[in-house]
């Protein structure tokens, strides 16, 4: 069976892995997933990520915990294949009053809501992380 929404699958694997206190989670790799993992690492939500180059590339994300609790409190898909959500530069959401991050896909690539606001850009809101 084919996967309808690979990004939602990635976010669910991270959510479930942290709920089960796993050290890392593995999933099929894709360019967009790697870009999202890079953003999560830059923002401090995951420890690291690695791509295993095999016949089927696999993305492994090392999860991050603080005093035994997952660093990621909520990770939620916003724009999905059946309902795309686009926001202009003035409409970009502030997740948890600025404490969280919204990952936005713009014409210049993936960026956080803060970076998109600074660059005066809007785009497709991929997910919220807090």
UniProtKB/Swiss-Prot annotation:
Pfam families: Ribosomal_S8. One of its GO terms (molecular function) is structural constituent of ribosome. It comes from the Bacteria. Keywords: Ribonucleoprotein, Ribosomal protein, RNA-binding, rRNA-binding. The keyword Metal-binding does not apply. Belongs to the universal ribosomal protein uS8 family. Part of the 30S ribosomal subunit. Contacts proteins S5 and S12. This is Small ribosomal subunit protein uS8. It comes from Shewanella halifaxensis (strain HAW-EB4).
